[in-house]
From Swiss-Prot:
Major localization listed first in the record, in broad terms: plastid
Full protein name: Cytochrome b6
Positions that bind heme b 1: H100, H202
Gene that this polypeptide is encoded by: petB
Coiled-coil ranges from the UniProt annotation: none
Gene source species: Thalassiosira pseudonana (Marine diatom)
A Pfam family annotated for this UniProt entry: Cytochrome_B
GO biological process: photosynthesis; respiratory electron transport chain
Subunit structure comment from the entry: The 4 large subunits of the cytochrome b6-f complex are cytochrome b6, subunit IV (17 kDa polypeptide, PetD), cytochrome f and the Rieske protein, while the 4 small subunits are PetG, PetL, PetM and PetN. The complex functions as a dimer.
Compartment(s): Plastid, Chloroplast thylakoid membrane
Amino acid sequence: MGKVYDWFEERLEVQAIADDISSKYVPPHVNIFYCFGGIVFTCFLVQVATGFAMTFYYRPSVVDAFASVEYIMTSVNFGWLIRSIHRWSASMMVMMLVLHVFRVYLTGGFKKPRELTWVTGVILAVVTVSFGVTGYSLPWDQVGFWACKIVTGVPAAVPIVGPPLVLVLRGGESVGQSTLTRFYSAHTFVLPLAAAVLMLTHFLMIRKQGISGPL
């Protein structure tokens, strides 16, 4: 094992990286309330793992979507547990995100020089809500269908750009297969990719600037 470590150390200087990570200064005022952001990230990882597992069985079709979810819940080994964890973790992620935003705001973590960290966090909040909106409709049951219809119809009230935006979201004049395909693509590819990039940017800025001091 020592030879393997020495091989990597010679090429990547892993010890220097480990020392940099472990020696990062943590202000003495930091307490348990500063863990909300980390919990959000943990929930995101759980969402990725459980969501990926369900993609093996879920079918994004208006005909088969509900039946495939029912199959996951009743026939797939531990499918009920995986989907339940996915739902519970989604709720936990939103709740922890709200608490994280309040904590950052109340402790002044958005002030100079951390404005960009705050901006990326706000965008991440929008992405998180978008996860909920798109995922809610994927079972394509009565609740999911009407939720999708209402959500995609909201932009119609916006002058000029509203109606074209509705067409883009729905993939046509009415809610149907094209809408479900768009929601599935957004939920499983577009939003996770955006979240990963934004989280990396968010973490790098926190790493660079450190945790804000007490008020």
